[in-house]
Amino acid sequence: MNVIIDYKVGNLHNLKNALDFSSVENQLVSTADDVRKADRILLPGVGAFSPAMEQLKNSGMLDALQEKVQTGTPLLGICVGAQLLMDESEEDGTHAGLGWIPGKVMRFQHQLKIPQMGWNQVSQQKADPLFQEVADEMHFYFVHSYYLLPQNSEHVLGLSSYGYDFASVVRKDNLWGVQFHP
């Protein structure tokens, strides 16, 4: 079962509606027991990093998510959900993330208009099952003021450009993160 983590942060219903429309079996979950039954996990998120991390910690699902990640269950973080996978974020001070993908979440340079809002291309850097049936340079919708900066360039699957190139798709083992809204 594909589960969408409901930790009261994110546009869960748009994601669920998109999966339903595509006939992809899915379920919104908000308990550790339901997380433990997952075959694949979607971790959405919108808003600020620190409150999202606090909500995830307070949800009671963090230990179950950690167990699933350690046993190889595929997990896709979306927008702030992708940012939470990193070690830390500099949004409103320095805040610890999940630390599942080494790296930081950085603010776009001040001379850029933020948030970046609109359609942007993703340039695929290497082949990956995530890109199956997705054309290189395809446009996706972005709304963000911070970007992923993985410590290891091997974790970068896709780049986008907004003033400069930034990682818009990352992967480490069974973890994927996308900065855009699919």
Task: Please identify what each model-predicted range represents.
Residues N2-V24, F180:
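N-terminal beta1-alpha1 ligand-phosphate binding loop
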Residues Q70, K104-P182:
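Amide-donor transfer/coupling interface in amidating biosynthetic enzymes
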Residues A38:
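An anion/phosphate-binding loop that grips the pyrophosphate of nucleotide cofactors and donors
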Residues G47-G118:
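Cysteine-nucleophile active-site neighborhood
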Residues L42-P44:
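Structural motif
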Residues D34-V35, K68:
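Structural alpha-helical scaffold elements that stabilize or flank donor/cofactor-binding regions
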